[in-house]
């Protein structure tokens, strides 16, 4: 009598039948599929032992069921993306979920490096400075009327320029004759002393500190010989081609102030009427 050779599950004889051997014993094909086969996540049917099985994460598929949920294209040996548990080929994913580059108009592919600003998207290599046309990458930039500039290009194009050196002013300038200047560029034409923050005047559009202007251009007091400068409310008296500070315009003999008083010239001197009448 021959030894029994039965299916480990249904106990039906396997003589003359196709079977599959496992560590737990032999199985007829139907029992093997019912016991060990995975269920296809798409069609919910068993994936038989003679079917090609594909799996993604914890889901299993017949080869014919592993396809794009939109265009039904097979994803076997094709790149794909999972979106909300649905499988999509790259073309459908890009069409449905990817954005277009605002510069070149091409699709920004999933996983590629991109930049987003103001509701727009760019390929990293397409986000360029509108001035030098170099990629901005992670550098600081300044938006202006739909354009984007790196900081050096923006300053070079839009920042005010110093009236003296013509270089851009990026911070802390001063205004002279309605033009911007670097603080260090606004200096006295005579002594080169910085003028920012102090009183100064000008001649022929050139700026001068008070001291240089007085020495170079101001009339000299006929009494003390020092320059007469009008800054700060200074007052002076003129007679013919001579000038005096208010506090210097006094009688040469008695030192009485002659401001607003009658006086008599006496050579290089001026006298009050009393001293003039008194004689030499």
Swiss-Prot record:
Q: Which residues form the LIM zinc-binding domain?
A: 40-92, 101-153, 162-212, 221-275
* Positions carrying N-acetylserine: 2
- What is the tissue specificity? Expressed only in skeletal muscle.
Q: Where does it reside? A: Nucleus; Cytoplasm
Q: Which UniProt keywords apply?
A: Acetylation, Activator, Cytoplasm, LIM domain, Metal-binding, Nucleus, Repeat, Transcription, Transcription regulation, Zinc, Zinc-finger
Its function?
A: Recruited by SOX15 to FOXK1 promoters where it acts as a transcriptional coactivator of FOXK1.
Protein name, UniProt field: Four and a half LIM domains protein 3
Species of provenance: Homo sapiens (Human)
